[in-house]
Swiss-Prot record:
GO terms for cellular component: endoplasmic reticulum membrane; vacuolar membrane. Fe cation 1 binds at E113, E116, E124, E127, E165. Signal peptide: none annotated. Residues 1-47, 94-181, 234-246 are cytoplasmic. Residues 69-72, 203-212, 268-273 are vacuolar. Fe cation 2 binds at E113, E124, E127, M161. Monomer. GO terms for biological process: intracellular manganese ion homeostasis; iron ion transport. Its main location: membrane. It holds the Pfam family VIT1. This is Vacuolar iron transporter. The gene is VIT. Vacuolar iron transporter involved in the transfer of iron ions from the cytosol to the vacuole for intracellular iron storage. Involved in detoxification of excess iron. The transport mechanism is not well defined and the role of protons is not clear. The chain crosses the membrane at residues 48-68, 73-93, 182-202, 213-233, 247-267.
Length: 273
C-alpha cells in the first residue's frame, strides 16, 4: 500500500495536480492512518537496480568487444559466461560484506549513543540544542524546548540524534538482511547479464556467425530495449521523469557497448588476421 501511495503521489506531482495530490493523501490516510512507509524496501530496490544495470552493461560491453574482435561464437560464449558468474559472485559478496560492515558500524554507534544519553544526558541535550540553533536557525529558547520535549521519548531522541549528528538512519537490519541483499545482487546481475549473452547465442543459432556486425546489432538492440524498460522502472522510485531516466540508461548502455565494439574492430584490423 505504501509503495503504491508514493507512485500515485509522484504522478500527481509530475502533473502539477494539487487536487489529485490532496485526494491521494486523504485516500491513503483513511486506509492506513497516514503510515506513508516511504522506505519502499529502498535498500532492496537499490540493490536490485544496481545489480541489474551493472550486470547487463558489464556483459554487454564484454560481448561487444568480443564480437568486434570477430572471435568465434564459442569463445564469445565461454568468455561471456565466465565473466558473468565471476562478476556476479564478486558483486554479491561485495554487497554482503559492505552491508555487514554498515550494520556493524551502525550498531556500534547506537550503543555508544545510548551509553552517552544514559550517562551524559546534559551534554547530549546540548549537542542537539547546538544543532537546532546552528543548522536550523532556531532561537535558543525554542531549541531548548524542542530538546526537552523530544528527550521524553528516549528512542525518538536516539534516532533523531543519530540522524542529525552522524547522518545514520537506524534500521532493524541484521546479518541475515545483508545475506539477502548479497543474494539479490548476485541474482539480478546474473539475470540481466544473461540478456546480451542470450541474444547473441540466439542470433548465432539461426544466422551466420561470420556477419559479426549483424550479431552486434541484435545484441545492441536487445540490450537497449531492456535498459529502456529498466529506466522506466527505476524512475518510479526517483525524482526523474520516466522518459528522462529511461533515455539516460539507453545513452549509458550505448556508450558502454559501442566503445568495446569499436576497440575490438580496431584491434582485429591492426592484427592483420
Amino acid at each position: 500500500m505504501g509503495k503504491q501511495k508514493i507512485i500515485d503521489a509522484r504522478k500527481a506531482y509530475y502533473e502539477g495536480d494539487i487536487e489529485k495530490s490532496k485526494e491521494i493523501h486523504s485516500h491513503y490516510h483513511n486506509l492506513d492512518k497516514h503510515a506513508e512507509h516511504h522506505s519502499l524496501d529502498k535498500d532492496h530496490l537499490k540493490t536490485i537496480i544496481f545489480g541489474s544495470l551493472d550486470g547487463i552493461i558489464t556483459i554487454f560491453a564484454i560481448v561487444s568487444g568480443c564480437v568486434g574482435a570477430n572471435i568465434t561464437p564459442a569463445q564469445v560464449i565461454i568468455i561471456g559466461v565466465g565473466n558473468l558468474f565471476a562478476n556476479a559472485i564478486s558483486m554479491g559478496f561485495s554487497e554482503y560484506t559492505s552491508s555487514t560492515a554498515q550494520i556493524d558500524f551502525m550498531l556500534a554507534e547506537r550503543q555508544r549513543e545510548e551509553w552517552e544519553i544514559e550517562n551524559c544526558p546534559t551534554e547530549e541535550k546540548q549537542e542537539m540544542i547546538d544543532i537546532y540553533i546552528n543548522k536550523y536557525k532556531f532561537d535558543s529558547k525554542d531549541a531548548k524546548n524542542l530538546v526537552e520535549i523530544t528527550f521524553r521519548n528516549k528512542h525518538f531522541f536516539l534516532e533523531h540524534m543519530m540522524s542529525e549528528e552522524l547522518g545514520l538512519i537506524l534500521t532493524n537490519e541484521d546479518k541475515s538482511e545483508a545475506f539477502k541483499k548479497g543474494i539479490l545482487m548476485f541474482l539480478s546481475f546474473c539475470f540481466f547479464g544473461m540478456i546480451p549473452l542470450f541474444s547473441y547465442v540466439l542470433y548465432n543459432l539461426f544466422f551466420s556467425a561470420e556477419n559479426y556486425t549483424s550479431s552486434f546489432a541484435v545484441v545492441f538492440i536487445s540490450t537497449l530495449i531492456t535498459l529502456f524498460i529498466l529506466g522506466l522502472f527505476k524512475s518510479q522510485f526517483t525524482t526523474q521523469k520516466p522518459i528522462v531516466c529511461a533515455l539516460s540508461m539507453v545513452l549509458n548502455g550505448s556508450i558502454a557497448g559501442m566503445l568495446p565494439f569499436l576497440f575490438g574492430v580496431l584491434l582485429k584490423t591492426n592484427s592483420g588476421d
